[in-house]
């Protein structure tokens, strides 16, 4: 069951990743080439000791903020895709995502928007995505970068802790299972 959960998650993440890449290649983002070149120059300058690490961080933060602000529409679309796929699809299909269907498992429990949202705070970083979009409008530059880095670190920590819980607990429950009251079960085979 552990391997099936991991496999289903990987299938789902790959599918969502492909959709996000397609969107990012279809929707134009302003100044991307210029900002990427600027980031490369900054990296070279810090590696050659031409600027201090503090100046590098400050300039990096400005570039990151501008890039994310210019791509907020794409970030919003990506967040919407995650919400639809990991919240709406399991409600409509009574517990399935494509990955879960392929490997023969599904969600069981009270499948509603709130419970699936709670579950996806841990597994997909949905809250981190939403908060990052909000931060674009309420902060800027170094504050924006610092807060999004902290959110990202917390998200990675949640995923790692939850993965170890699923690996080593006898009931296979991770943080997401406990806070959402939704469990992952094997589909009974019809004979």
Describe each model-derived feature in a short phrase.
Residues 1-143, 147-165, 172-191:
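Short, small/hydrophobic-residue-rich motifs at membrane-helix boundaries and re-entrant hairpins
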């Amino acid at each position: 069951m552990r391997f099936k959960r991991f496999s289903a998650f990987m299938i789902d993440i790959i599918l969502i990743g492909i959709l996000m890449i397609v969107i990012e290649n279809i929707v134009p983002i302003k100044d991307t080439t210029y900002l990427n070149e600027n980031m490369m120059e900054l990296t070279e300058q810090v590696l050659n000791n031409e600027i201090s690490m503090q100046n590098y961080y400050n300039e990096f933060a400005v570039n990151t903020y501008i890039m994310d602000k210019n791509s907020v529409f794409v970030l919003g679309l990506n967040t919407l895709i995650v919400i639809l796929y990991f919240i709406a699809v399991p409600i409509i299909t009574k517990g399935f995502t494509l990955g879960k269907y392929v490997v023969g498992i599904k969600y069981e429990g009270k499948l509603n928007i709130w419970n699936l949202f709670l579950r996806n705070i841990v597994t997909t970083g949905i809250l981190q995505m939403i908060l990052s979009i909000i931060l674009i409008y309420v902060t800027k530059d170094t504050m924006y970068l610092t807060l999004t880095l902290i959110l990202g670190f917390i998200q990675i920590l949640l995923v790692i802790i939850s993965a170890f819980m699923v690996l080593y607990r006898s009931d296979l429950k991770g943080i997401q299972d406990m806070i959402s009251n939704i469990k992952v079960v094997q589909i009974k085979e019809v004979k």
